[in-house]
Design a protein with these regions (language model features):
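Macrodomain-like recognition of ADP-ribose-binding/processing modules
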Residues: 1-236
């Protein structure tokens, strides 16, 4: 039996949903906020299927979630980040296929592959959501990429993640350039994914909506709040 209480404060660009499943609490908070300004212990970082971190010529854009992460935490030490990613993939026994891009030989991994990086007492889940060409530009974009990313992410957190406060962007929107991944659609998908979970994998889910998207009028907060309230009520 699932009980839920929904509350939302539109004027502060905040929507929150608190629910309970048996004896477990489920909290979903949706905010207009930059991901790394969210107070959390774990974060989701969408990445390319090469797990490349190169920022030369914006292979990884500084304006992307991954780029912002790298500048904030590994600005002068991307080699260490590469090592941590490769080490975790190897620990999972995941072996990529041989490929090449403008930087040379590289391993390619299936969409939905997750590498967990621990850094400064926080956990970062890199999830492959897009194939890219030799210059790092997304190719073969499909909404199926979003589904694959969610499946891989939720499985990874359940298997080797941490049950804590998890902050995530709207995966598939923005730099991923997946046409069908509209803000409204991905918000709904994210809410549904976590409300439908049978297993508790986090104490709190913080879904971060880009302040730029909000400023550009791409976000309908009232519509989002109504859907969140509906899902919470539906699960009572």
């Amino acid at each position: 039996m699932v009980g839920a209480i929904a509350s939302f404060i539109i004027n502060h660009e905040k929507i929150s949903c608190r629910g309970s499943k048996d004896d477990d609490d489920l909290i979903i908070s949706i905010k207009v906020k930059s991901l790394f300004n969210a107070s959390a212990t774990s974060y989701v970082i969408p990445t390319n299927s090469y797990f490349r971190t190169k920022m030369d010529d914006e292979y990884v854009s500084p304006n992307s979630v991954q780029g912002a992460f790298q500048i904030k935490f590994f600005k002068n030490n991307l080699d260490e980040l590469d090592r941590l990613i490769s080490e975790n993939l190897a620990q999972q026994g995941i072996v990529g296929t041989d490929s090449q891009d403008r930087f040379g030989n590289v391993k390619k991994y299936p969409l939905g592959t997750v590498a967990k990086v621990n850094h400064k007492n926080k956990h970062f889940y890199f999830v492959a959501i897009n194939d890219v060409n030799q210059y790092g530009k997304p190719i073969n974009q499909s909404y199926n990429n979003v589904s694959a990313a969610f499946n891989g992410l939720l499985t990874a957190i359940k298997q080797f993640g941490h049950c804590d406060d998890l902050a995530m962007p709207l995966i598939g929107t923005g730099r991923a350039a997946i046409r069908d991944a509209t803000i409204d659609k991905v918000v709904r998908e994210t809410i549904d994914q976590f409300i439908n979970l049978e297993d508790k994998i986090a104490r709190k889910i913080i879904i971060c909506i880009s302040p730029k998207d909000y400023a550009d009028g791409k976000v309908k907060m009232k519509k989002i709040s109504n859907y969140l309230e509906y899902r919470c009520e539906f699960e009572k």
